[in-house]
């Protein structure tokens, strides 16, 4: 695993919603080496532990990386004080990402739940109109990146728990409907564990390969502290792996959710 530890200039910052921000960094070496589904560890000034944030998108040609995160505590609140022109101290890219085939046969479905929506964007950019993006949120004011997915050419289905926009309810029925259409090569998902369970179950029932990116508390981010353990069934045996180093992406056939 090749990663870099450095401070990179912030060239853009946007507020996507209440407490949700996107940052674009100029970091050519990270952009060149990053894979879809990997993450970074960001240093929050005054705090010992870094905060893990998924990579939303990279532009290898321009040497940039976009990160999207939600303020969920004092650490991410401190990071959100950084502005355009400041330096962001990151370790990146980390972990193992999605195994997205270069040969793009068939369709793919990406399923994002809330702040699990960002790490799937580059899959939509790769597949364009052969990607269906099912994005679930609590309400209209929590919806993010739906326009970015549309600009990538994806067929976008937004779901909200309260019905304030898009499909009223969870991602379950839209996912079942899309799988029933057939010609689906894979399903990729990131979001809350109950959603991931539903995605894996639906994909298995349809006989479609799936991968999920786990949301997990982390310490070191490089596999040393074993804070972020998860269980998989591999070769008929139960094994404990580290989300940060062995993941955060795992096959739906293996991971125990």
Residue locations for each model-derived region?
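Short, basic/aromatic-enriched C-terminal tail that caps enzymatic domains
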Residues: 1-4, 240-257
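Ferredoxin-reductase
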Residues: 2-84
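Structural signal for conserved beta-strand scaffold positions within catalytic alpha/beta enzyme cores
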Residues: 12, 57, 158-160, 212, ...
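FNR/FR-type flavoprotein reductase catalytic core
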Residues: 74-215
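Local cysteine-cluster metal-coordination motifs and their immediate loop/turn environment
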Residues: 119, 193, 216-248
